[in-house]
Structures are given as structure tokens and as C-alpha cells.
Amino acid sequence: MNQLSESYKARLSNLLPSCVAFFKYLLKRLTHDRVNVNAGYLAYITLLSIVPMLTVLLSILSKFPVFANVGEVLQGYIIENFVPASGEAVHTALQEFVANTGKMSAVGGGFLFIAALMLISNIDKNLNYIWRVKDKRRLVFSFSMYWMVLTLGPILVGASIAATSYVTSLQILENETLSGAFNLFLRWLPLLLSFFAFLGLYILVPNKKVHLAHGAVGAAVAAILFELSKKGFALYITQFPSYQLIYGALAAIPILFVWVYLCWMIVLLGAEVTAALGEQEHWSEDLDMIHSSAESQLANEGSESSDSANSTSQ
């Protein structure tokens, strides 16, 4: 019993210094990677690509009769659960933009598809930089992955919404106990969706192996921050509506930009947490060492990939 208590004390005594070292390293890593600058860049690209993405998504869903009206439900669900306050104004503006794209030619539609691919490509590049990945995926593989996201993604989302609507319509949910449990599940559904979306992003996008536990921690941090930021941002907009006095009818535009920027800050922060957990050997390094180790790691991975390519050609 005494040995067990001593082992727990030893673990606790080592836990505090490890946590301090981790948070110091994380802060230095955030500074080195200029997360705030990259979040602004991704927010700008997102605003340029959000209409093309919605257009591609809705056009794919419209090809399947079983997903009729799913596009409207999907837009409403996203606005209600993932865009805090002024969601109706943003929803109306996006609907007008998407409706106008229906007048475009096939060439214009092709450019919309390219713009949607650009957004996914930039997300891929930024996350791989956080993980110090130098060995890029082959162009064919990258294009196949982006194509799969743009085609299978809407189908899976539409299928999940259709399944949820079917379950909701079942008479079995008239039971008070089951109905209460289902309502509780729906209340936690946005957080669960955020968690699994972040987890998939941190596990699948980097072109290197990421431990599931590290990805789960980063995804949990990002999902919790995302839910808290929704409530905080909505509170700020409703309690301090000075932006409406300045921008008037155009107030939805800066609101959307600030919200998208905040979302990318959270996404990149969760990615930094995930990547830092896998670099425990560097937790004691200073900022200069972080910079040099990052550059050397990228150089080593690049030389290893070139060596493997040479050996394959031989």
C-alpha cells in the first residue's frame, strides 16, 4: 500500500513539471509558427472559397433524389449550430450568392470547383507545416483525396441528415424517456460533431503518423474552445452591437470574417497541441532551438525522401 502511494506521489511530482514544460513549449511553438498570421490567411481564403464550396456541395446533393431539400436543412443546421448570432443575415447572404452562381457557365463552374480545391489544398499545406512534413504527397494522390472530400463528403453529410430525420420521425420517440435521451443527444451533437471533425482533420491530413491519443487531446481542446467561443462571440455581438452602427446593413460581412478567423485560430491551436504532444523530447528547448530543430527536421525528411527516390530509381 505504501509503495503504491509512493508511486502515485512520484507520478504527480513528475506531472507538474511536465505540464509546465509542455505549455512553455506550446507557447514558443505558437510564436514560431505565427498561428495568428496563418489563421488570417486561411480566413481570407475561406471567405473567397465558401461560396464555391457550398455551390459544389449543394450541386452534388441535388444529383440524388433521396437528398431532396437536404441542402436547405444542412445550411440551416450549420448556421444555427456553428455560426453564433447574426446567423440569419449570413444565411440570407450565402443563399443569394449561391443562387447567383446558378447563372454561371460551365467554365465558371469549373473555376468554382478549382477555388474549392484551393481551400482544401491550403488547409493541407498549413497543417503539414505544423507537423514539419517536408515529404509532400504525390500530385495524383493529393488530387484524388481532394476530389473524394468534395464528392463523398456531401453524400455522407446528406446521408447522416436523412438518417437523423428518419429516426426523429419514428413513433418510438414518443416515449418520454427515449425522447428525453434523444433531445440530450441532440444537445451534445454539435460538440460531438466538432470533436470528430477535428480528430479526423488532425489524424488524416498530416502526411505522417499521428498518435490517436494525441489527436484526441487536440480535438477535445479545439472542440471545447469552439463551443465556448460560440457562446462568447454571440454574447459579445448581442450585448455590444456597436458594429451595426458602423457597418449598418453590411454588418454581417465583418462578423463572418471575424468568426472565420477565430475558428481558424482554434483549428490551428488544436493542431499545435496535437503536434507538440508528439515532440516530448523538444519540450525543454528554447525558441531558437525550436526554429533550428524545425528546419533540420524538414531538411532531414527531405533528404530521406530524395534518398528513397534515388534508391527506387536505381
From Swiss-Prot:
From which organism does this entry originate?
Vibrio parahaemolyticus serotype O3:K6 (strain RIMD 2210633)
Which InterPro entries does the UniProt entry name for this protein?
UPF0761_bac, Virul_fac_BrkB
In terms of superkingdom, the source organism counts as Bacteria
Gene Ontology cellular-component terms listed: plasma membrane
Q: What is this protein called?
A: UPF0761 membrane protein VP0125
Region described as Disordered: spans on this chain: 295-314
Transmembrane regions listed in the UniProt entry: 41-61, 104-124, 139-159, 185-205, 217-237, 249-269
Tell me what topology the record assigns in the membrane: Multi-pass membrane protein
Main localization is membrane
Write out the similarity annotation.
Belongs to the UPF0761 family.
Give the UniProt subcellular location, in the record's own words.
Answer: Cell inner membrane
Cite the PANTHER family for this sequence: INNER MEMBRANE PROTEIN YHJD, UPF0761 MEMBRANE PROTEIN YIHY
Alphabetically sorted, this entry's keywords are:
Cell inner membrane, Cell membrane, Membrane, Transmembrane, Transmembrane helix
**Does the UniProt entry include the keyword Cytoplasm?**
no
